[in-house]
Amino acid sequence: MEENNSLSNKYDAALAKYNTHLSDADIQARVADLIEKKVPENNTEEVKKFLFTCIDLTTLNSTDSDESVMRFTEKVNQFDDEFPDLKNVAAICVYPNFAAIVKNTLEVDGVNIACVSGGFPSSQTFIEVKVAETALAIADGADEIDIVISIGKFLSGDYEGMCEEIQELKEVCKEHHLKVILETGALKSASNIKKTSILSMYSGADFIKTSTGKQQPAATPEAAYVMCEAIKEYYQKTGNKIGFKPAGGINTVNDAIIYYTIVKELLGEEWLDNQLFRLGTSRLANLLLSDIKGEEIKFF
């Protein structure tokens, strides 16, 4: 019992170093002010080209097959020939059973293979299954792993259970980047988003990510603001730079520019790099291309 209390106290002590008592209304007001004052200046071709290079080009459909994922990857292979003046996406994101297909099809340098894992999207399975799935994805070629926190554990106060799962999966990933999805729409409050951000970083996350895209609401500017504040404070206390990835519900170019603006204003120019900033999306690539080229493009 004493050991459990000390473990619980360890996580409470980590949270106590940060302000986790946030007002949702205050966050909404700050975000609205930031969008009004700062977003217009970032609506430039240069920013849009940069945002394209931050995309984790994603296909996470129940209808995905070896053939469809192969075609999806071939589009990335063809991109440089079709758009020689633009840089390619950051990564291709697929279910773990398709890692080998992407690895065997992908021919371009600099595009990573990201796989969702750990019982995505609900995270409701045995830790042994999560470990095995993650290890198999990496063995098949995944460079990056995207997992979901055990939301039920967090909401019931089992911080230890939530954090130990992340730590165990990071041990499996080793040098491969681990992106930890908070599923912010299920957390209901800015305070919970702040707490899960801190606990995830404390447990070994290389990135924190808003959403799976399988639950509504998905990414929101308010969630992004809280997460970026947490990343900034964590960096100030530890010297460790953690990446940020909004995902799900990024339906317009302006949505992407809003997330860019939040990162720029809260974290600074250092984070404006696709090693620390990603966008998880299936539709944004064509929208950005269309905006940059001034005509409708449906390349992907």
Language model features with spans:
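Alpha/beta enzyme core
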Residues: 39-52, 58, 63-87, 97-244, ...
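Metal-centered catalytic cores of metalloenzymes
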Residues: 286
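N-terminal start-of-chain detector that recognizes signal peptides
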Residues: 22-26, 30-33, 86, 217-218, ...
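Charged, compositionally biased N-terminal leader segments and the immediate start
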Residues: 1-53
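Short, hydrophobic beta-strand segments that form beta-sheet elements in well-ordered domains
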Residues: 92-94
